[in-house]
Amino acid sequence: MARFWVCVAGAGFFLAFLILHSRFCGSPVLRNFTFAVSWRTEKILYRLDVGWPKYPEYFTGTTFCVTVDSVNGLVYIGQRGDNIPKILVFTEDGYFLRAWNYTVDTPHGIFAASTLYEQSVWITDVGSGFFGHTVKKYSSFGDLVQVLGTPGKKGTGLNPLQFDNPAELYVEDTGDIYIVDGDGGLNNRLIKLSQDFMILWLHGENGTGPAKFNIPHSVTLDSAGRVWVADRGNKRIQVFDKDTGEWLGAWNNCFTEEGPSSVRFTPDGKYLIVAQLNLSRLSFVTAPPVGSIGECSVISTIQLADQVLPHLLEVDRKTGAVYVAEIGAKQVQKYVPLNSYVPSFGS
């Protein structure tokens, strides 16, 4: 009996030695064990708000996009399906308010551009019907205000401006608009428009080089005046100067398994949140300061269940809450920060 306990103790000490040796000396010995020991610790930044929304039965289609009007505390959701409302409106507390369906064919991206003076909702429509291949501005109640593109007709033209499966947009408080045009369409381009819809600069062409794209799927801005584009097909994020359009660099090292499908910054500007569709994963990447973007560094992840498929996400610029449109789970989920944010910039 004594010999048995001596053997147990010896085995325990030997296992402890292997673990410490692997930790401090980089030994590959543990790789052959049937269990995995991870020495990487991640910051836990967010938790799921299991009570949002209050009544999920209002999700009657496939939820592709979500945006937040942080001025008025409203959440807009775009869903697809036959004979259903395409746009749902909830409060940030999760209560359903209303729905509308006017002149919306197939929503892909959505953005709430709200100031103290105007509240509007922009939608990229990739439908093949009369309302498709457009970027449209609505009032908060669904009244059509502005149409960019040639409704129902895809194209590459700039005068008049045409789109082919415009994926998403970002609207600055100044009114300037950034559009990623090419969710599998002809264009693969990033366009900046002035508030009166004149083209200020653009980058576009299918390819793998700098300022070329393969499915530019999401776009956002940071407080340093940089434009960040999820170049999904090329498995990278490209960065540009918002004023000149100059290419500033790319992150290639963090997305080798799956390209990024959505990008948004936390309100304090510390982290870029990246959704990866087919991995069903959200990653929190350290945001670089002014200057070189360097290499990306993931400091936290949220691994969702298989086939949840997070498509596009949005961040409430006041509270820091993250809303994720999941096309696999056909729902939008809300994640809240463990620590309160102090609003700093409109991302």
Swiss-Prot record:
Keywords: Glycoprotein, Repeat, Secreted, Signal
Superkingdom of origin organism: Eukaryota
GO CC annotation, single: extracellular region
NHL repeats by residue range: 47-93, 150-196, 200-243, 294-338
Alphabetical list of Pfam families matching this protein: NHL (PF01436)
Main localization, broad class: secreted
Compartmental location: Secreted
Positions of glycan attachment: N32, N101, N206, N278
UniProt signal peptide: 1-25
Protein name: NHL repeat-containing protein 3
